[in-house]
């Protein structure tokens, strides 16, 4: 929806701050994932943005894009969302030997580094009032590209998840 997340406001004492927006039900959906090179030299962020709710079809397309861009085995960490357990997603993963799925424990978003990417993105678009979906798309795309191009931000997302217990084996 085109209702902005509000982080902070200001108004003269005794007056309620007002952030005007158009209450429209337009929205965007984003699929994304952090990548780490096998020798952990470089972090990456791959994402796709859709103007509709994401279904298993888009998840499969996203996985196909990952396989096209990344070499070697690809391990995907997923939360327990029902869309990730859809039969189309499971069938696609079984038919592509390079793709391995691992699941986060139930109700553990703090272990998912991608959740911290979404936090960074929401912070970047907070207190803005896009007039339409195209303006929202520009804001989200700029925010995601900023995160994508910053090794320190990507590293911070991974470090935050590790701080909460995400561990991986060498």
Question: Which sequence ranges carry the predicted segments?
Answer:
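Extended, low-complexity cationic-aromatic segments
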Residues: 1-64, 160, 164-170
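Short, glycine/charged-enriched secondary-structure capping and boundary segments
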Residues: 5-9, 90-93, 116-118
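Generic recognition of short, well-ordered alpha-helical interface segments
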Residues: 25, 54-61, 88, 116, ...
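Conserved catalytic core of Hanks-type protein kinase domains
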Residues: 33, 69, 120
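RNase H-like two-metal-ion nuclease catalytic core shared by retroviral integrases
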Residues: 79-80, 87, 102-124, 134-136
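C-terminal anion-handling pockets and recognition modules
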Residues: 114-170
